[in-house]
C-alpha cells in the first residue's frame, strides 16, 4: 500500500514535469524496484564514487534491493541501517534539477524513521493506511511520531478501502 502510493505520487509528479526521486527506505521489505519494474537493475558509480540512481520513466530510484542478490534477505540493524540510509541521502548523485525526493518508509516508527529525522529534519509526511483497525492503529502512532519529531503531516491517505465495480457501478469494500 505505502509503496504503491509513493510510486503513484512520483509518477504523477513526473507526468507534470516535476523532477522527482524515490528512496526505498523500507530496507527489509523493499518493493519499489518491483513496482517500477527495475528489480534486475544495478546502479553505477561516477568518478567520485557517488551512486548513480536507476532511472525509470524520468524518475530516479534508489533501493537496497539494487545492491543485494535476488531473494536474499537484508539482515541488518542499528548502525548498518543508518549507514545505508545515510548513503541514500549523501552519496547518491541525484540530478541537479531534482525537485523532490519521496521516501518510502517501512511500517512503524523504528530506526529508519529516527535516522531520516536526523538527516532531513524539515521533512513533510503523508501517512498511508488502510481501513483495517490494526493498520489504522499503526498510522495513528506514525502520525504521533511525526509530530513528536517535528515533521509536518501533509495529509492521510486511506488506501484499499473500496473500489467502484465497473459492472454494476456499486461501491465494493476491499
Q: What is each residue range found by the language model?
A:
Residues 5, 33-37, 73-74, 114, ...:
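Short acidic, glycine/serine/threonine-rich loops at helix termini
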Residues 1-24, 143:
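Walker A/P-loop phosphate-binding motif and the immediately C-terminal alpha-helix
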Residues 16, 34-39, 65, 87-95, ...:
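Conserved, well-folded catalytic cores of nucleic-acid-processing
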Residues 3, 24, 32, 62, ...:
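Residue-level signature of catalytic and energy-coupling elements of molecular machines
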Residues 13-71, 89:
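Phosphate-binding loop that captures ATP/GTP phosphates
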Residues 99-100, 106-174:
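Conserved catalytic-core segment of NTP-binding enzymes
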Residues 43-45, 64-115:
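Switch II (G3) loop of P-loop NTPases
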Amino acid at each position: 500500500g505505502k509503496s504503491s502510493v509513493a510510486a503513484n505520487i512520483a509518477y504523477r509528479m513526473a507526468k507534470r514535469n516535476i523532477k522527482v526521486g524515490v528512496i526505498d527506505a523500507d530496507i527489509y521489505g523493499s518493493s519499489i524496484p518491483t513496482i517500477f519494474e527495475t528489480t534486475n537493475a544495478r546502479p553505477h558509480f561516477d568518478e567520485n564514487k557517488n551512486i548513480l540512481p536507476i532511472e525509470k520513466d524520468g524518475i530516479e530510484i534508489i533501493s537496497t534491493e539494487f545492491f543485494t542478490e535476488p531473494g536474499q534477505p537484508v539482515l541488518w540493524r542499528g548502525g548498518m541501517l543508518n549507514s545505508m540510509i545515510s548513503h541514500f541521502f549523501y552519496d547518491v548523485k541525484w540530478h541537479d534539477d531534482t525537485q523532490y525526493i519521496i521516501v518510502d518508509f517501512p511500517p512503524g516508527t523504528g530506526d529508519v524513521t529516527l535516522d531520516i529525522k536526523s538527516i532531513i529534519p524539515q521533512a513533510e509526511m503523508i501517512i498511508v493506511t488502510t481501513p483495517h483497525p490494526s493498520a489504522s492503529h499503526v498510522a495513528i502512532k506514525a502520525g504521533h511520531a511525526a509530530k513528536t519529531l517535528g515533521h509536518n503531516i501533509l495529509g492521510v491517505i486511506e488506501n484499499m478501502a473500496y473500489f467502484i465495480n465497473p459492472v454494476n457501478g456499486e461501491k465494493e469494500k476491499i
